């Protein structure tokens, strides 16, 4: 099906382009969302009349998105979740969770603006891309941790997936422990004799 794009769509085209897409993609997504029109003579004439208005509206949305992007780009958000000793979460962090955290910080971000291929299931730092506008994309850091103090340590670059790192255990290697035990045993034998 041939359609006229009403806004820039990644991997498809710019506003005003006439492109050919699969019928289902046009009928189920592009046309209902108001992102495209069927490419017939009547719609082509209508689009040419409305082109200036559409461009002005697009520029306005883009400038609003850029203002938000300046404030939000590169920010870090902490997500506290329960997890096992290996760092595996009891549950996951999805686009809904990320949207709620960013919204609670005072920014209006919808779930559909977050590009996350699959839910986050382990603790760590994740770079997430947000599409505020088809032409404005930014990145934020999501810090998934078991506690706020752990998130701070993680942000400083510490790896927190081993038991030693989680509980701040400072164990000596097994060989050193074995030598100390042998020295202690030898001393106790000498004392008994």
UniProtKB/Swiss-Prot annotation:
<feature type="compositionally biased region" description="Polar residues">
    <location>
        <begin position="184"/>
        <end position="193"/>
    </location>
</feature>
<dbReference type="InterPro" id="IPR036935">
    <property type="entry name" value="Ribosomal_bL9_N_sf"/>
</dbReference>
<keyword id="KW-0687">Ribonucleoprotein</keyword>
<dbReference type="GO" id="GO:0003735">
    <property type="term" value="F:structural constituent of ribosome"/>
</dbReference>
<feature type="region of interest" description="Disordered">
    <location>
        <begin position="155"/>
        <end position="193"/>
    </location>
</feature>
<dbReference type="GO" id="GO:1990904">
    <property type="term" value="C:ribonucleoprotein complex"/>
</dbReference>
<comment type="function">
    <text>Binds to the 23S rRNA.</text>
</comment>
<comment type="similarity">
    <text>Belongs to the bacterial ribosomal protein bL9 family.</text>
</comment>
<dbReference type="InterPro" id="IPR020070">
    <property type="entry name" value="Ribosomal_bL9_N"/>
</dbReference>
<dbReference type="GO" id="GO:0005840">
    <property type="term" value="C:ribosome"/>
</dbReference>
<dbReference type="InterPro" id="IPR036791">
    <property type="entry name" value="Ribosomal_bL9_C_sf"/>
</dbReference>
<dbReference type="Pfam" id="PF03948">
    <property type="entry name" value="Ribosomal_L9_C"/>
</dbReference>
<dbReference type="InterPro" id="IPR009027">
    <property type="entry name" value="Ribosomal_bL9/RNase_H1_N"/>
</dbReference>
<keyword id="KW-0699">rRNA-binding</keyword>
<protein>
    <recommendedName>
        <fullName>Large ribosomal subunit protein bL9</fullName>
    </recommendedName>
</protein>
<dbReference type="GO" id="GO:0019843">
    <property type="term" value="F:rRNA binding"/>
</dbReference>
<dbReference type="InterPro" id="IPR000244">
    <property type="entry name" value="Ribosomal_bL9"/>
</dbReference>
<keyword id="KW-0689">Ribosomal protein</keyword>
<dbReference type="Pfam" id="PF01281">
    <property type="entry name" value="Ribosomal_L9_N"/>
</dbReference>
<keyword id="KW-0694">RNA-binding</keyword>
<dbReference type="InterPro" id="IPR020069">
    <property type="entry name" value="Ribosomal_bL9_C"/>
</dbReference>
<dbReference type="InterPro" id="IPR020594">
    <property type="entry name" value="Ribosomal_bL9_bac/chp"/>
</dbReference>
<dbReference type="GO" id="GO:0006412">
    <property type="term" value="P:translation"/>
</dbReference>
């Amino acid at each position: 099906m041939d359609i006229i794009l009403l806004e820039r769509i990644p991997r498809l085209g710019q506003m005003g382009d006439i492109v050919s897409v699969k019928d289902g993609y046009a009928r189920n997504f592009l046309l209902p969302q108001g992102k495209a029109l069927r490419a017939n003579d009547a719609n082509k004439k209508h689009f040419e009349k409305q082109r200036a208005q559409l461009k002005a509206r697009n520029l306005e949305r883009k400038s609003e998105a850029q203002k938000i992007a300046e404030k939000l780009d590169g920010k870090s958000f902490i997500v506290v979740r329960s997890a096992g000793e290996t760092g595996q979460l009891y549950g996951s962090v999805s686009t809904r969770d990320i949207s709620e955290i960013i919204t609670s910080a005072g920014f209006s971000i919808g779930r559909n603006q977050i590009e996350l291929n699959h839910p986050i299931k382990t603790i760590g730092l994740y770079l997430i891309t947000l599409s505020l506008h088809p032409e404005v994309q930014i990145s934020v850091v999501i810090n998934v941790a078991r506690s706020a103090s752990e998130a701070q340590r993680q942000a400083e670059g510490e790896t927190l997936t081993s038991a030693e790192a989680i509980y701040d255990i400072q164990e000596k290697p097994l060989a050193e422990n074995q030598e100390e035990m042998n020295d202690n045993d030898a001393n106790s034998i000498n004392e008994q004799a």
